[in-house]
Amino acid sequence: MVLAAAMSQDADPSGPEQPDRDACIVPGVQGPPAPQGQQGMQPLPPPLPPPPQPQSSLPQIIQNAAKLLDKNPFSVSSQNPLLTSPASVQLAQIQAQLTLHRLKMAQTAVTNNTAAATVLNQVLSKVAMSQPLFNQLRHPSVLGTTHGPTGVSQHAATVPSAHFPSTAIAFSPPSQAGGPGPSVSLPSQPPNAMVVHTFSGVVPQTPAQPAVILSIGKAGPTPATTGFYDYGKANPGQAYGSETEGQPGFLPASASAAASGGVTYEGHYSHTGQDGQATFSKDFYGPSAQGSHAAGGFPADQAGSMKGDVGGLLQGTNSQWERPSGFSGQNKADITAGPGLWAPPASQPYELYDPEEPTSDRAPPAFGSRLNNSKQGFNCSCRRTKEGQAMLSVRPLQGHQLNDFRGLAPLHLPHICSICDKKVFDLKDWELHVKGKLHAQKCLLFSESAGLRSICATGEGTLSASANSTAVYNPTGNEDYTSTLGTSYAAIPTRAFAQSNPMFPSASSGTNFAQRKGAGRVVHICNLPEGSCTENDVINLGLPFGKVTNYILMKSTNQAFLEMAYTEAAQAMVQYYQEKPALINGEKLLIRMSTRYKELQLKKPGKNVAAIIQDIHSQRERCMLREADRYGPERPRSRSPMSRSLSPRSHSPPGPSRADWGNGRDSYAWRDEDRETVPRRENGEDKRDRLDVWAHDRKHYPRQLDKAELDERLEGGRGYREKYLKSGSPGPLHSASGYKGREDGYHRKETKAKLDKHPKQQQQDVPGRSRRKEEARLREPRHPHPEDSGKEEDLEPKVTRAPEGTKSKQSEKSKTKRADRDQEGADDKKEGRGAENEAGTEEQEGMEESPASVGTQQEGTESSDPENTRTKKGQDCDSGSEPEGDNWYPTNMEELVTVDEVGEEDFIMEPDIPELEEIVPIDQKDKILPEICPCVTATLGLDLAKDFTKQGETLGNGDAELSPKLPGQVPSTSTSCPNDTDMEMAGLNLDAERKPAESETGLSPEVSNCYEKEARGAEGSDVRLAPAAQRMSSPQPADERAQQSSPFLDDCKARGSPEDGPHEVSPLEEKASPTTESDLQSQACQENSRYTETRSLNSRSPEFTEAELKEPLSLPSWEPEVFSELSIPLGVEFVVPRTGFYCKLCGLFYTSEEAAKVSHCRSTVHYRNLQKYLSQLAEEGLKETEGVDSPSPERSGIGPHLERKKL
């Protein structure tokens, strides 16, 4: 028999120290906490006011205790054979505590892993139970009973158990002996309470610690242990829950409950244990009690070990543990008679005590703590069950009541919920009801009143931790283990989860328990939204918690079953969603463990679950990769609609379990946009109709997407690169893509594409001009985006316009192109070209609008023939530009080197002239530029020229400024043209040279020409169709420009008139440039292999200048790509023959023209300097553009370069 030596201690002894002790204060018993022992480690839960206890029960208890003492080896007269000496006891206690703490720490570490937690809890419970003295030792050590003179903490557990009157017997180890038995001091213990010093023989009892020996021996000890949660069996977590409470090995609350429970009866320990109330904290356990009760926190196992070890101590230990509610046959009777033994609090019907149920509300609080603790052990939510909630009436529930309480599906319908008195007509209504607030509240109240506290409010019933720990008052004990008394609490938990009280989700243990025994690993999902729920939605609910092995989606009944790979995963899922209801399309779902299936044997017809899940995962991965690639809200590079997750954003919680279960990406991370695409890709058919989705995107996005996004789609691969640029400024992206196109075209003989485009450009020329005029204004704002901060600063007035125009153009282009692609490429080309001319989207449109050139360049990069064909196709259908863009993108990177391969490195300069149209004087310059073509071959230089030409007037001014500011200009140029940025260093030197040279030459026209040439060269190198398109749009003006430009440029070199001309003609040039471009395209076609072509390109350079203005934007994006390859010599015009070949931009001499113009002009340094220079020109050009008529003194500064270029 287990002697529960409850020492009735004066209320005072415990004092405030009690909270620190591990001894649990039984909620029912009110009394000052016993003083904390030296080893007291954990604060006791605050004692609840003791229910009034009939005095009659106390004598009975005393008598029982006396009997137990007589029988118990630890009887008052005899020493506890297990206790050798206070020192050894202390040592044992310390060791036990240390071991327990370690185990607990391990348990905490695995809290999120229900399987591991369960195993660990079992081990812990076994360890605790296996040590007869462990609980005892632990109690004093944990509780640190201060009474023991030896310093052994006498955990006078103030067990104000609800079950125990304030006079509840406190088991105190002999304080002097440092008896392992914690003294549960029930400070308010009535004086008449029979105080039996548990170790009177062994250790003198402190007068303050009168020990009342409860005859717990029968079943008490074990039950007490069980009270502590059939720790080893089902509630190891709960047992530790007390630890979570702060008691090393016990759930403080449970300990309290156990104490109270134990106190309540002779077998209160066992009773407490059963109830999981074994709320006598460790204190509670007298030496005897500790042995079995030490389990206080450790259920069955302790009892088992206690049996052997403390068999003498606990006569009914095994049976008690096994029969938590009965606390063993002996205790069971006692417990059942508990009301008689212990007068239940006036409010509590002890006579109705159910061994499975907590002894009393007060005890249940401890028990509740226990449940909470176990929950903590498992779910760290043990505290959820409030002690108040934990306090449940002792009244047992009827079987049907338990079923309703647990939320089990009724056997017959319609069914009236015995808890809520609500009639339900079908299972769906029942599930809704069970998960509803009304039922949860009723269950909570009922559990409090009926002592079902152990039943965790597993709204699903699945999560009920109670199942795990009978301590939870496993209503299942009543239901499943009707005779829980015989069964250990562990058994009870079978359906403990059935409890729907959300308050008691010791779900993990209960859930595991319940599910393992019942539902298995299948989760039942109800209330799915009608018609809008897909398989992916359902699967996504489970993926965060682990692998989903199978599922059934019953759309007709709006329910689904998910089979998880592991029971723990299913339980975790249910528990989580009970706490945070899942939502699909804004509708809450009812998720619980399935009582119908333990596992899904049937396979999804037609669709392989693994395949669907794999699709979901793969899409998530893709989304993750794309998101990583994405910068900002831009669309994924891939056109594939699959860029987005197949399934809608997961509704499942982002809980830590997601990472733990790692069955896939966090569905909660999925985007809403992903979810939008889901309907098309639902059922895992993400691959289905990607083209359709793409078409859909193309149809709708052109209006919705930014110009950047449109370009991205239109240009495909180019869009990929440009995304990064786009994110910052769409203009640069386009220009970048244009630049790429130029490079490709440059390599690819874009002249053919341009020739093809000439008609288009001509067609587009008229509207294009008007647009160009408008967009010329808009381009200025654009330039800041394309051009870097320097450009933005210097060119802000103009740049601002340009970016806006470019954006609108590009947006229109992309939209128009897509529409046209869907409808006709011709319309798109027109708009695109107009946009190019206007927004200087020459590059983009070279890529997009004049896909012929762009495609040719892009695809031509892949193959020269495809280039031409693509150019034609692009011209015919801009929509082709997208695919071309995709192909082009990868090829473009590789093809940058194609200039060398094509052998037109310095020659191929098919410019995208759309933007040059703005500046008519540039056309003249362009003519001159063809002469300078070889120099212009430096595409970057041409691009820069474009930018400046775009700026028009600004170019002239920029030139003037450049001569004084060359170093500064170089940076600004680099700003406008990132390529130049690469060449900043050299550019500074070159600028220094240029300053003198420009000053000497004083040819602002040359400067503008040079820039134009550069622009042309850049575009020529790019050989974009955009210029071609522009040329086509306005072939005549282009011709005129070509004619005018070359002479005019020459003249300009001699004089600064071109500067004025470009400034004045910037709108005119825009218009004329298309024509010039058309002619130039023809020329470029011829001259692609020649410098002559470069010259023709130069004649287009005004447009190119605009394009370049954009290009500066693109150049930044290209800078890493193009400059890294540096396959295209740019700014060749800056290389001037002197004693050697001198680069004005970089200030470097080369003995060989090839080394200077080919190698050097491809160098990063040269590119950077050219960028800087063009940026400066662009800035100046913007300023001049604002004052269109203002000639460019700066151009005169740039002139020297242009002259040298001409030379």
Curated annotation (Swiss-Prot):
The keyword Metal-binding applies. A zinc finger (U1-type) spans 412-446. GO terms for cellular component: cytoplasmic ribonucleoprotein granule; nucleus. Residues 43-54 have a biased composition (Pro residues). The gene is Rbm20. Residues 853-863, 970-979, 1073-1102 have a biased composition (Polar residues). Residues 839-848 have a biased composition (Acidic residues). Associates with components of the U1 and U2 U1 small nuclear ribonucleoprotein complexes. Residues 631-650 are annotated as: RS. One of its GO terms (molecular function) is zinc ion binding. SUPFAM superfamilies: RNA-binding domain, RBD (SSF54928). The modification Phosphoserine is found at residues 638, 640, 643, 645, 652, 729, 789, 853, 864, 879, 881, 963, 999, 1034, 1046, 1057, 1066, 1078, 1096, 1101, 1190, 1192. Residues 1-58, 625-686, 722-896, 951-1110, 1181-1207 are annotated as: Disordered. Disruption phenotype: Heterozygous or homozygous adults display left ventricular dilatation. Left ventricular diastolic diameters are significantly larger, although there is no differences in the systolic ventricular dimensions or contractility indices. Subendocardial fibrosis increases with age and was accompanied by electrical abnormalities, such as widening of the QRS complex, atrioventricular conduction delay and a predisposition to arrhythmia. Rats are at risk of sudden death caused by heart failure. It is found in: Nucleus; Cytoplasm, Cytoplasmic ribonucleoprotein granule. InterPro entries: Matrin/U1-C_Znf_C2H2, Matrin/U1-like-C_Znf_C2H2, Nucleotide-bd_a/b_plait_sf, RBD_domain_sf, RBM20_RRM, RRM_dom. Keywords: Cytoplasm, Metal-binding, mRNA processing, mRNA splicing, Nucleus, Phosphoprotein, RNA-binding, Zinc, Zinc-finger. Changing residue 1192 to A: No effect; does not affect ability to regulate alternative splicing. Its main location: nucleus. This is RNA-binding protein 20. The keyword Coiled coil does not apply.
